Amino acid sequence: MISEEVFSSICGPPIAANTAISKDVGVYAHSLTPSWTVKSSFKKSSTPVHCLALSDSHVFAAQDQKAHVHVYSRLRGNQESLVPFQERIKCLALAGDVLVLGTVEGRLILWETCTGRQVTTPPCHVQAVSCIAVSPHHILSASEDSNVNVWSLAHLLESGQDVGLEPDRTLSNHRAAITDLVLGPSSNPETNLCVSASKDKTCILWNYLTGQVLRTLLFPTSPLCIALDPCARALFVSSEDGNLYLVDFFGDKPLLGSRSAELASIVVQVNSPLGVADEEAGSASCLSVSYDGTSVLTGHTKGKILKWNLVDNSHPTELANLNASVTNMIMAPLLRGKASSQTVTVVKPNQAQRQYTLTAQLEGNLSSNSRFDQMLNSKGFSPETIAEAIASLSAPSSGGSDDMDLKRQNDELREIIKEQQALQKATMERYAEAK
């Protein structure tokens, strides 16, 4: 049975003198289904909000008020290395094998974990980078200066382009610091979606490739953390007053698409919450949606992890109490993507390196070519492809039983026609005799 796994992190001192919870553990790996259990843990980490990233082989955790990133091996279950940087890290995200870090000085640092190559941008924001979101082709960095910068990942990683890097565009409709940023799964220029939350009590839906504002949502209090439904059909928002909101994009009154009745410039007021967390839980600092989109997990400042069941809309249930502020919750993918290599040990960044060396473990048999590779490298159609085509055209039809059934039906239809013709002939003869 496939098990959903969620990673959580904590930051700050213990809330209560609870001896049942280890004080050294900073990152937890929980099993969500079929039952909630702690599968593994990683020690000596204090990870603030937006400072946890996850790959198939490693866990990356930036440390609070420090310029360090702790790298943990998921395969070995221990801390692999401590990676220092020149500036304090405010947030991070993982784009494939590239770890993207935002600093308090407003810069972006890109670290290729398989090569050690490091790319640093100029100060792209006036204030600290508060959160980062990545897609297969783009990086979005949000800041306390209320702006969101859209970067091309390929352009940032282009060799010899460490100086003079600038974002492709800037999204600047917010009037206060941005608290969270999420991307939809689509990379199509017409259907890509980005949602930013801000202390100005709004969430803005963007087409981040064009910079178009698709919709502005206004809440009673400031949204602290947001998450999209797995299919980007709805937005989950947790605000500073403990309320959890569900905004349906394609409901009775669609907010997006051609069926939307209102102009994109019209602000939508969101007043009715899906539920309210108990006061002793505190406000939510992180939010995660299950793989099937039927439940929501929230991590709170008082150490509790709550599960909201969307099927029956019941009161949230407490899954765990980590005895410290829960700052990050990341759902691990159910199925690993097919990759030809795996990072067993990360290569620490080195700005002075002159050689580009890739360090990875190859997986599978790389010597055997696929059918596509064989067709691509052959001149015209390969002999095997031509032979298969000739065989498929010359082979006798496999539907012999179907042909016999059709022949039988045709014979029955001919008999019926003959009977009708004989009946018509007899009727006409009687009609002629009657005249």
Which functions belong to the PLM regions below?
Residues 28-31, 69-73, 108-112, 148-152, ...:
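WD40-repeat beta-propellers
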Residues 1-32, 59-60, 99:
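An edge-strand/N-cap motif at the start of beta-rich repeat modules
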Residues 27-43, 76, 164-166, 268-274:
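A short helix->beta-strand "capping" segment at the edge of beta-propeller domains
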Residues 37-40, 78-81, 117-120, 159, ...:
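A structural motif specific to WD40 beta-propellers
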Residues 252-285, 303, 311-435:
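Terminal intrinsically disordered, low-complexity extensions flanking WD-repeat/beta-propeller proteins
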Residues 11, 63-65, 102-105, 142-147, ...:
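Conserved strand-to-loop turn within each blade of WD40 beta-propeller repeats
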Residues 42-49, 83-89, 122-129, 171-178, ...:
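WD40/WD-repeat beta-propeller blade N-cap
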